[in-house]
Amino acid sequence: MSDQATFEFDTDYFVEEFSHCFTGECRVKMLPILYKISQIITGNADLADALSIVLGVMQQHLKMQRGIVTLYDMRAETIFIHDSFGLTEEEKKRGIYAVGEGITGKVVETGKAIVARRLQEHPDFLGRTRVSRNGKAKAAFFCVPIMRAQKVLGTIAAERVYMNPRLLKQDVELLTMIATMIAPLVELYLIENIERVRLENENRRLKHALKERFKPSNIIGNSKPMQEVYELIHKVASTKATVLILGESGVGKELVANAIHYNSPNAEAALVTSNCAPLPENLAESELFGHEKGSFTGALTMHKGCFEQADGGTIFLDEVGELSPTVQAKLVRVLQNRTFERVGGSKPVKVDVRIIAATNRNLVEMVEQGTFREDLYYRLNVFPITVPPLRERGSDVIALADHFVSAFSRENGKNVKRISTPALNMLMSYHWPGNVRELENVMERAVILSDDDVIHSYNLPPSLQTSKESGTAFGLTLEEKIKAVECEMIVEALKNSSGHIGEAAKELGLARRMLGVRMERYGISYKSFSRYA
């Protein structure tokens, strides 16, 4: 249990409070037991440790054959054995009850103790843990609730053969007192355990959602260049190889890094991302490798860097081309033997971490210019993946635009269902210097500006409208303009035919085979147009 989970327990108060219940010889026998149990509870913040000792005291001093403590999981509405003596591990596993089921379930349901003078003859006896109704032993079984603020938290039960019925009554009273004494500890355990289980379940749910989200098949885009990227992700994800992701800003390099990690054997471990671009040299070292207490002004405590945080998982170094020569040198060592020292420290720190790096810079040119270490480049460039710019993924623009429209419609409480043909033409003819990130921003703006269920051309920013109207905004060559017009005509024909290649070819006056060749050249897939049916 955490240090914050504490409670006040007055040993003398409990002993004095319960002392009136016993007289004479019984009092002499029972009060030392109560006092001993109260000391056990006071000195143990851990429920399992405390219960184990309490049950041991019951077994030693009360000659009980079996002792059982159950806890009530209100979320699952089940009662389970938390600790016991006289039961095997297999028997403990079988001790799971619903509320109202068997003697234990009835005690939790009613909040009242049950005494079975002859256990095997009691109508609620289930025999789930050991004994059967046909057994010869005439053991009594008594089960009392563990309660706190009128809420049943669990039960404590015992089994023993009694020759004197008066002793049974005294033991039931004693067990009731023990239940009262352990109730605060049980309550704190349940509160913390429920929260821990909730967080664990939430963590599992989020990790599963991330794994589903970052499946290569869930990345939007069916163009040939992206199919090649998916194939590379599939091949490298299951390995421990260092990956270098190349591509312009906004193409989705971080998405590729996520897909690799969440489809790897280390998917359950951490993925730690560090953006190297905005960090000055001294902060970059501390960010990546951590620092020791007092290593510089303001270093009041030891700090673990990204590499230590990612131990057992993956670190994603975004914009790795921006690192200073000093940090580059330290990174070479990490790549070589997975060891480093924190800033201000001399003790080597060893980590087991997979490295994925990304950059929009031309590292080969930087190596030639002497601004990027050659040995670092070759250690990073084990398995390069180049993410194509959006202008080379013609058919993906429509699929991505539709995805963003749906997402931003939900986010903004709108009901935008489609993009008009003129608006689609503008999206297809634009060269997207900001790539997918720019398209995302454009579609968010368009959804916000839309007054009905359609994205119109006038909902798009002026830069797209100007480019479509003039056809010269990009400074394209004649050949590039001809290709753009040809691509636009093919897209329009496929939209009109709902992706049917034969009908589109007929509309364009081309043979089906020739249209297929041109579609492959421009990376256009007929599947992207089936929604127009």
UniProtKB/Swiss-Prot annotation:
Q: Known InterPro entries for this protein?
A: AAA+_ATPase, GAF, GAF-like_dom_sf, Homeodomain-like_sf, HTH_Fis, P-loop_NTPase, Sigma_54_int, Sigma_54_int_dom_ATP-bd_1
- Is Coiled coil set as a keyword in this record? no
Query: For ATP, which residues are the binding ones?
Result: 247-254, 310-319
| Membrane spanning residue stretches | none
Q: Pfam families under this entry?
A: GAF (PF01590), HTH_8 (PF02954), Sigma54_activat (PF00158)
All copies of the GAF domain together span 46-186
Instruction: List every stretch annotated A domain.
Output: 33-193
| Sigma-54 factor interaction domain ranges (all copies) | 219-448
CDD domains xref list: AAA
Q: What is this protein called?
A: Nitrogen fixation protein AnfA
| Organism listed in the record | Azotobacter vinelandii
